[in-house]
């Protein structure tokens, strides 16, 4: 039996030792598949699954969300999932995993699909029918199903053969016969797409073409995905016959042509269909046109916008996915408020003259970044109507307030007994995703009294569901919510239009209808780049220029997922970009232009301009690979400096400015940032079970000069070795462990290597591995050219030939000091040759070059350029240069005795005494990290023994620091000990940290924080504690330390920290920097104190510590966090803390008493549902739906955690346990009743409907079935397993009104049992002791006279009677109008 102290213990749960507070449910679990964060989490799981080979489980979770939980929209997830197209994946490619997503039945393996799962084509039929405003005909169904069936069969064969190959160890482990079988399947699939795609849009009927276009869009996506796999994986599958270099070139041509063809086809068919709607004459035809636009946008255009990303030449495979944000907006939903012809949109006039940014359909609708919804003010009225003297509610007007203005829709009467106005405040961080409507119907003119044949209607109440599942009520009275208007998945309500009710009666000028503007949730997010995931991968990001901060003119564009920005001659535009991780990015623009146009491009990093030059935006009219849109042909253009295609961008907010310096318009779609990723040598599995070495990579003409190895051995694998070879000679050997061990190694390879192989061993050497390099490969024949890279060692020889005012880059790589360049040249004329050294695209050194030359660059540089400056007339130079990277020869270690002396002094200063068993009082954890960096820099050759001894002492200091630290994992060595936001990650390899650090990214759609609580039992009474840490970079970082009420709460601005050059006696951090507004930044090291008085083990306040980002573009990198004992409190300090603690305890006890009074009755009632009060056990046999519905969950004051806004508080956890217990009881009741969906939680599923039976929502939140009159009924035929004619059953019914339940049974002779229910209020009635003459029983619910509301019905086996019970047809009833479990959702 559940008791109070179990659910609401006197000692709250231990944050570290117990299960942490769970995340709040996504909005999708509350109402609609709305919350983008749910999709993002499932996408992360799929990405991990593809690389780990467990993708079928990840897809099964998606299918469960679609078909069981109803929290995911199929179409939306697939569209978002296509962002994985650029991932570096194993040799199976990306098409194979997606087969199980497109066709649920093919997601086999160890994770079969849900029983009711459909393929994506079947799942989108309801939307297609809604778009064409009719049901698909039998012929249309046969046509569509037949085509898709043929594709599914081909996909199944492809999948099966790929599985067979992988089960044998991969393509290099199987014979040519199996490879041929697979390539035949590949080519068959390719032929199917080529041959059958056109049939979906070539029918001679307009409807057939329109209904086929969503199919066409999905199939085109599948085809492009297959072609991309052929291009990127084909040489691995079959490089000798079907996928030779020439064949791959042919497929590259195919994918480019198909991208253009598929995009144009979708756009042309969409435009043709749009034109067929003409100019709408009323709101009904207007709404149909907008519904067409909505379905075509989400099912077709949103897919077509992604087609160019399938081209591997344009979007090559990298370490991360690709995210192209959408900003296009949709008019949806349409809500009738007051009409003359029932509550429909029919014959209702449309007036858009008062709609901002509508522009007769050619506008962009209100920009959600400029017009942010603040409040709705509704003006209702209740007055005696002209029909029957009834009080009728009307919505006179609605006032929409945004950040720009307040606009009134409708008009206020001069005199009227108004009720209101009613206010709805809108939180932009928790936007509206659904609108519910309560209606009031009135009888037609001349009728007497109430009549269900309704001809007039108005809205009596509105409520708005927010993304987190909470509901905002607009009041106005009213009864049940009978209509739900959900926005498209992952959208929110960014604006609300109104149109007047224009008639000749007294109600003219009222609001006739409301029209929502649905906006993608990412549209208002900051433009964030450089955000790593858990594996450290950084995505390619694309931001519509529609998100610009100034400039340009918005023009309608259908195909890009965003409207275009027209940049006319002389106009400028600027877009802010926030970078989380400093590094190199390729910047690209997607645009359209009818003429060659010069655009001045300025990347302003606030102190530097890495790009500040005029760029030619060439005419795109005749571009063969561009995509046609409404404003021209769109192409992608790289924005490069004169010497580098990548741009160094610091970790901060920068601004990109473009100015049209030409004479023609340029239409800007988006700006893209592609992170520089390390060259990938190999990614996939290795296996030597055949007995031969596994050659991962080899080349006849290219060498790499360094290597990064990362992987994990299989559990059955033994240890082995990796060989790096150069022309057959083993250059380096790297150990590869076995038995599930992970491994990581990185080495320079000065000699260069052109082959990587895993040595064979018995019984097996196998696992997964990623092999990369820090730098691109170099020609092994020492060929020259423009560009090059950091070859290291003696690699990197360049031939150069310059004339006139020419230049060439001979090195581009990591930032280094001491790069060595030598060579010679011949010349004509009188040349001056200059060697320019660059750092972050800025010249840091210019050195004259004479032949022969031998130059060492003394400054830090990441790029070298040879520049020819003719002194007198024309000149030429021809020569050779060899660049040697310092990563081989450059030695930064400390070798002088004074260095050893300085570092030894600093090591000893870490300790309080010579015994080294206690740290000095003022030493922080970060102090230890700075010292270890210096110890590690001591020369092994000169001070080997001393270095070893000093490192031992520093290790001891680190152990002592961890022992005194009350936080677990203060340097994130135990990441699981922290609560963290969904996108918060740990990162290594920072110049200021020896340990890992945490990256708190910009919040986005979910908060960005870390949090930990130190339990009371760990503290000492009357003691001061120090809370400290090191911030390498912090923008809008809030530091909170709380015991009795957030004693420390401070937002800091810490500029990006850059290490000083490492010296033996100087600090590691940091040159002084100012914040973005020019003020001096906060210090990198923070330290606060918090006082603990008497311990309170019962209340357990402890010390709570958290860091979080409080602004959308904030970010932070933090480590070395500590809470440690400082000193005992003085007498006056004890008195002060006692006073604070006493006040806190008073409020604490008051709140607990209030909560206890609310939850104890609920605990008692839930205990009554279960045998022995065991909430995890079985419910009692006499429990009915009404017993569950009668339990009303309380409203507790604090459901969210006080710091972590996306997690439950202790009270929220209690509510979740209550709801879980009710859900389990309900599920058991569902299993015990013979009727399916007897509670009507799934609308009228499993029931056959006659007449106008439909589901409605009552004012208290209950969903019930409404039978409006005697012509309405629902029925269900059940089949009883293990039928026994002597078995007795009980019928339990809960409803309101006058109706009957009939049970028809018998085979040769029909028997009908009738149960009558006549109650004015919601009442439970029962019929006991029923027996049946056959195993098939038809149950029918009918209305007898007027409205009959059905809450639930159950038919259950009767328990065995006791001696004093009589089961002969007993009936009973009880009245109860309490709310159901559904009102607490």
Curated annotation (Swiss-Prot):
Where composition is biased (Low complexity), the residues are 1370-1385
Which GO molecular function annotation, any one, does this entry have?
toxin activity
Spans annotated as Disordered: 768-799, 1359-1385
Q: Which UniProt keywords apply?
A: Sporulation, Toxin, Virulence
A single Pfam family it belongs to is Endotoxin_N
GO BP annotations, alphabetical order: sporulation resulting in formation of a cellular spore; symbiont-mediated killing of host cell
Domain of life assignment: Bacteria
Instruction: List all Gly residues biased stretches.
Output: 782-796
Q: Does the keyword Heme apply?
A: no
Classification via Gene3D superfamilies: Galactose-binding domain-like, Pesticidal crystal protein, N-terminal domain
Q: Which InterPro entries does this UniProt record tie to the protein?
A: Cry_V, Galactose-bd-like_sf, Pest_crys_dom-III, Pest_crys_dom_I, Pest_crys_N_sf
| Miscellaneous field | Toxic segment of the protein is located in the N-terminus.
According to its UniProt record, which protein family does this protein belong to? Belongs to the delta endotoxin family.
What does this protein's UniProt record list under function? Endotoxin with nematicidal activity.
List the protein's name. Pesticidal crystal protein Cry5Aa
Species per Swiss-Prot/TrEMBL record: Bacillus thuringiensis subsp. darmstadiensis
């Amino acid at each position: 039996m559940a008791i109070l102290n179990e659910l609401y213990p006197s000692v709250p749960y231990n944050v570290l030792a117990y299960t942490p507070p769970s995340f709040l449910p996504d909005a999708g679990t509350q109402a609609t598949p709305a919350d983008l964060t749910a999709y993002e989490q499932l996408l992360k799981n799929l990405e991990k699954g593809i690389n780990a080979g467990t993708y079928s489980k990840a897809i099964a979770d998606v299918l469960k969300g679609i078909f069981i939980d109803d929290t995911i929209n199929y179409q939306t997830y697939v569209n978002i999932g296509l962002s994985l197209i650029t991932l570096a994946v194993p040799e199976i490619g990306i098409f194979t995993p997606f087969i199980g997503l497109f066709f649920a039945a093919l997601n086999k393996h160890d994770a079969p699909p849900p029983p009711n799962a459909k393929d994506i084509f079947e799942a989108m039929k309801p939307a297609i029918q809604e778009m064409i405003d009719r049901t698909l005909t039998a012929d249309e169904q046969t046509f569509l199903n037949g085509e898709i069936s043929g594709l599914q069969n081909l996909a199944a064969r492809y999948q099966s053969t790929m599985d067979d190959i992988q089960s044998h160890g991969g393509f290099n482990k199987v014979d040519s016969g199996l490879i041929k079988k697979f390539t035949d399947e590949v080519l068959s699939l390719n032929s199917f797409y080529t041959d059958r795609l056109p049939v979906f849009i070539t029918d001679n009927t307009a409807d057939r073409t329109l209904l086929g276009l969503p199919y066409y869009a999905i199939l085109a996506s599948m085809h492009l995905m297959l072609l991309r796999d052929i291009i990127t994986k084909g040489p691995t599958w079959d490089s000798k016959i079907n996928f030779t270099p020439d064949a791959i070139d042919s497929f590259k041509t195919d994918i480019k042509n198909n991208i253009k063809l598929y995009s144009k086809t979708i756009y042309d068919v969409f435009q043709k269909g749009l034109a067929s709607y003409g100019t709408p004459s009323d709101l009904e035809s207007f709404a149909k046109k907008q519904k067409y636009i909505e379905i075509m946008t989400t099912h077709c255009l949103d897919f077509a916008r992604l087609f160019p990303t399938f081209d591997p030449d344009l979007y090559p495979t990298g370490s991360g996915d690709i995210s192209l944000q959408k900003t296009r907006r949709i008019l949806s939903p349409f809500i009738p408020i007051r009409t003359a012809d029932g509550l429909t949109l029919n014959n209702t006039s449309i007036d858009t003259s008062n709609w901002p940014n509508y522009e007769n359909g050619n506008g962009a609708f209100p920009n959600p970044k400029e017009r942010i919804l603040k409040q709705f003010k509704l003006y209702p009225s209740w007055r005696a109507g002209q029909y029957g003297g009834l009080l009728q509610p009307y919505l006179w007007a609605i006032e929409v307030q945004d950040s720009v203005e307040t606009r009134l829709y409708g008009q206020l009467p001069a005199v009227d007994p108004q009720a209101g106005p009613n206010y709805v405040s809108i939180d932009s961080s928790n936007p509206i995703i659904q609108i519910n409507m309560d209606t009031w119907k009135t009888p037609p003119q001349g009728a007497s009294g109430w009549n269900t044949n309704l001809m007039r209607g108005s809205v009596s109440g509105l409520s708005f569901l927010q993304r987190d599942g909470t509901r905002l009520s607009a009041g106005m009275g009213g009864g049940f919510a009978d209509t739900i208007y959900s926005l498209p998945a992952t959208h929110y309500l960014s604006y609300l239009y109104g149109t007047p009710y224009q008639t000749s009666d007294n109600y003219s000028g009222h609001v006739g209808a409301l029209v929502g503007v649905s906006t993608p949730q990412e549209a208002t997010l900051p433009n964030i780049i450089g955000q790593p995931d858990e594996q450290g991968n950084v995505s390619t990001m694309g931001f519509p220029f529609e998100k610009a901060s100034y400039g340009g003119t918005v023009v309608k564009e259908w195909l890009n997922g965003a409207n275009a920005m027209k940049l006319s001659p002389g106009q400028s535009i600027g877009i802010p970009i926030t970078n989380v991780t400093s590094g190199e990015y390729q910047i690209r623009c997607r645009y359209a232009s009818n003429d060659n146009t010069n655009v001045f491009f300025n990347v302003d990093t606030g102190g530097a301009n890495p790009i500040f030059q005029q760029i030619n935006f060439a005419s795109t009219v005749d571009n063969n690979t561009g995509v046609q849109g409404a404003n021209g042909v769109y192409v992608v253009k790289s924005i490069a400096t004169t010497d580098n295609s990548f741009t160094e961008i610091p970790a901060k907010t920068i601004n990109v400015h473009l100015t049209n310096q030409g004479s023609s318009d340029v239409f800007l779609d988006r700006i893209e940032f592609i992170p520089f990723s390390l060259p990938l040598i190999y990614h996939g599995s290795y296996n030597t079970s055949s007995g031969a070495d596994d050659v991962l990579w080899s080349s006849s003409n290219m060498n790499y000069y360094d290597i990064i190895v990362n992987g994990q051995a299989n559990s059955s694998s033994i240890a082995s070795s990796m060989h790096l070879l150069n022309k057959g000679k083993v250059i380096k050997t790297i150990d590869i462990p076995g038995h599930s061990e992970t491994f990581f190694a990185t080495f320079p390879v000065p000699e260069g290597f052109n082959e990587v192989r895993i040595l064979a061993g018995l019984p097996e050497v196998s696992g997964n591995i990623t092999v990369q390099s820090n730098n691109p490969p170099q020609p092994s024949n020492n060929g020259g050219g423009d560009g090059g890279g950091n070859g290291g060692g003696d690699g990197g020889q360049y031939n150069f030939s310059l004339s006139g005012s020419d230049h060439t880059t001979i090195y581009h790589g990591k930032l280094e000091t001491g790069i060595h360049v030598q060579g010679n040249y011949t010349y004509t004329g009188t040349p001056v040759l200059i060697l320019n050294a660059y750092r972050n695209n800025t010249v840091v050194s210019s050195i004259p070059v004479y032949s022969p030359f031998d130059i060492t660059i003394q400054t830090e540089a990441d790029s070298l350029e040879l520049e020819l400056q003719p002194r007198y007339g024309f000149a030429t130079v021809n020569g050779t240069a060899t660049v040697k990277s310092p990563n081989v020869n450059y030695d930064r270690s400390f070798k002088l005795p004074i260095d050893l002396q300085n570092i030894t002094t600093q090591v000893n200063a870490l300790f309080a005494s010579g015994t080294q068993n206690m740290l000095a009082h003022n030493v922080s954890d970060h102090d230890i990290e700075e010292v270890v960096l210096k110890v590690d820099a001591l020369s092994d050759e000169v001070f080997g023994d001393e270095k070893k001894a000093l490192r031992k002492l520093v290790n001891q200091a680190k152990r002592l620091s961890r022992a005194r630290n009350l936080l677990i994992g203060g340097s994130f060595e135990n990441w699981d000990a922290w609560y963290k936001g969904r996108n918060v990650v740990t990162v290594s390899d920072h110049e200021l940290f020896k340990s890992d650090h945490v990256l708190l990214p910009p919040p986005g759609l979910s908060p960005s924080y870390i949090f930990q609580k130190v339990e009371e039992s760990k503290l000492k009474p009357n003691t001061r504690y120090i809370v400290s840490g090191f911030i390498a970079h912090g923008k809008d970082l809030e530091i909170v330390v709380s015991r009795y009420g957030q004693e420390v709460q401070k937002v800091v601005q810490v500029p990006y920290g850059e290490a000083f050059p490492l010296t033996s006696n100087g600090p590691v951090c940091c040159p002084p920097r100012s914040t973005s507004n020019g003020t001096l930044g906060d210090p990198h090291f923070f330290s606060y104190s918090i006082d603990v008085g008497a311990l309170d083990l019962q209340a357990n306040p402890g010390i709570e510590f958290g860091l979080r980002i409080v602004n959308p573009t904030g970010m932070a990198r933090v480590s070395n966090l500590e809470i440690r004992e400082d000193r005992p409190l003085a007498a006056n300090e004890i008195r002060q803390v006692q006073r604070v603690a006493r006040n806190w305890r008073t409020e604490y006890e008051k709140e607990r008493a209030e909560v206890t009074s609310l939850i104890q009755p609920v605990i008692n009632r839930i205990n009554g549902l279960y045998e022995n009060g065991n909430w995890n056990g079985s419910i009692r046999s006499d429990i009915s739906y009404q017993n569950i519905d009668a339990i009303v969950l309380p409203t507790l004051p604090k459901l969210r955690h006080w710091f972590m806004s996306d997690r439950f508080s202790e009270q929220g956890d209690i509510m979740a346990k209550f709801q879980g217990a009710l859900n389990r009881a309900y599920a058991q009741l569902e299993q015990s009743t013979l009727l399916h969906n007897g509670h009507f939680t799934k609308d009228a599923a499993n029931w056959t409907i006659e007449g106008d039976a439909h589901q409605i929502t009552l004012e208290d939140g209950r969903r019930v079935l409404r039978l409006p009159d005697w012509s309405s009924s629902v029925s269900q035929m059940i089949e009883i397993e293990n039928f026994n004619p002597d078995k007795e059953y009980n019928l339990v019914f809960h409803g309101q009104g006058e109706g009957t339940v009939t049970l028809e049974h018998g085979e040769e002779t029909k028997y009908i049992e009738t149960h009558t229910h006549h109650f004015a209020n919601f009442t439970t009635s029962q019929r006991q002791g029923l027996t049946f003459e056959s195993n098939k029983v038809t149950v029918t619910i009918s209305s007898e006279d007027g409205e009959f509301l059905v809450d639930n019905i159950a038919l259950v086996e009767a328990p065995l009677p006791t001696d004093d019970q009589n089961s002969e047809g007993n009936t009973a009833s009880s009245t109860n109008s309490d709310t159901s479990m559904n009102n607490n959702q």
